[in-house]
């Protein structure tokens, strides 16, 4: 295609490192990572890229989002031996091949050392909740319906306890073949935003997250909001390092990867 040219230079000198910012609706995907269980964001994007570039590529992502989780600002990269001279045309061509629930928002040439995971300094996730008795159908695929009164003041108090550096073992689900060297993570900020139609957005920003940590924090905040847990329970939950002490895991469909910071 006319926006790429095959270089005559050696592989090491001709390799370009391309960073993509992508957004996707997670409903149809079994998460970011390739899996025999069903379609993944990674495989869908890889297939379209290889169709354009005409060579095998490997993708790395800032976050391996779970099945059903959405993204507004996922960052991925790939190496190519093609010289992509017109990034805007490249984006248009790639989007024309991709399903409409997966979009390329931007593309950028990066230094060879750039890695979307290793160079990431923080990620921000947004989780949406509707606590009205009846949820509008348009919100159903993208927010957790909790049709009961919530004590927002108590939830805000709990947030202040969770911010900072802690051992978040109690907020980590077990995952086969995933072993952490430690469970200490730093939550930089949590904001509770009240939206229209009795909806909430919980924004959580941190340097790194454990498996399902964000969704378990949200589930715990909901338990506090409905009075099933108390604000005073948070320190003992953290100290327990016991997943059963914290709240329920919030469902995947309310979660968005919002921003990745470098």
From Swiss-Prot:
Binding residue positions for substrate: 125
Keyword entries, A-Z: Isomerase, tRNA processing
Gene3D superfamilies, per the entry: Pseudouridine synthase I, catalytic domain, C-terminal subdomain, Pseudouridine synthase I, catalytic domain, N-terminal subdomain
UniProt KW Flavoprotein keyword: no
CDD domains: PseudoU_synth_EcTruA
Signal sequence extent: none
Gene Ontology terms describing biological process: tRNA pseudouridine synthesis
Annotated EC: 5.4.99.12
NCBIfam families assigned: hisT_truA
PANTHER family noted in UniProt: PSEUDOURIDYLATE SYNTHASE, TRNA PSEUDOURIDINE SYNTHASE-LIKE 1
Protein name: tRNA pseudouridine synthase A 2
Organism: Protochlamydia amoebophila (strain UWE25)
Lineage: Bacteria, Pseudomonadati, Chlamydiota, Chlamydiia, Parachlamydiales
Gene name tied to this protein: truA2
């Amino acid at each position: 295609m006319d926006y790429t040219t095959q270089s005559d230079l050696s592989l090491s000198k001709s390799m370009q490192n391309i960073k993509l910012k992508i957004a996707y609706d997670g409903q149809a995907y079994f998460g970011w990572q390739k899996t025999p269980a069903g379609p993944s964001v990674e495989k869908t994007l890889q297939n379209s890229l290889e169709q354009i570039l005409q060579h095998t590529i490997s993708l790395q992502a800032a976050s391996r989002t779970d099945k059903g989780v959405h993204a507004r600002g996922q960052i991925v990269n790939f190496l190519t031996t093609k010289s992509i001279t017109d990034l805007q045309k490249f984006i248009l061509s790639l989007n024309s091949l991709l399903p409409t629930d997966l979009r390329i928002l931007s593309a950028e040439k990066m230094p060879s050392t750039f890695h979307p995971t290793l160079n990431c300094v923080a990620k921000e996730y947004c989780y949406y909740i509707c606590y009205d008795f009846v949820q509008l159908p348009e919100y159903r695929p993208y927010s957790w319906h909790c049709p009961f009164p919530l004590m927002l003041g108590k939830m805000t108090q709990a947030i202040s306890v969770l911010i900072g550096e802690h051992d978040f073992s109690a907020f980590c689900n077990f995952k086969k073949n995933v072993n952490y060297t430690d469970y200490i993570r730093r939550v930089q900020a949590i904001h509770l935003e009240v939206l229209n139609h009795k909806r909430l957005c919980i924004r959580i920003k941190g340097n790194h997250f454990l498996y399902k940590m964000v969704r378990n924090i949200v589930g715990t905040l909901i338990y506090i909001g409905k009075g099933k847990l108390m604000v005073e329970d948070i320190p003992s939950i953290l100290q327990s390092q016991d997943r059963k002490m914290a709240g329920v895991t919030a469902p995947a469909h309310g979660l968005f990867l919002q921003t990745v910071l470098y």
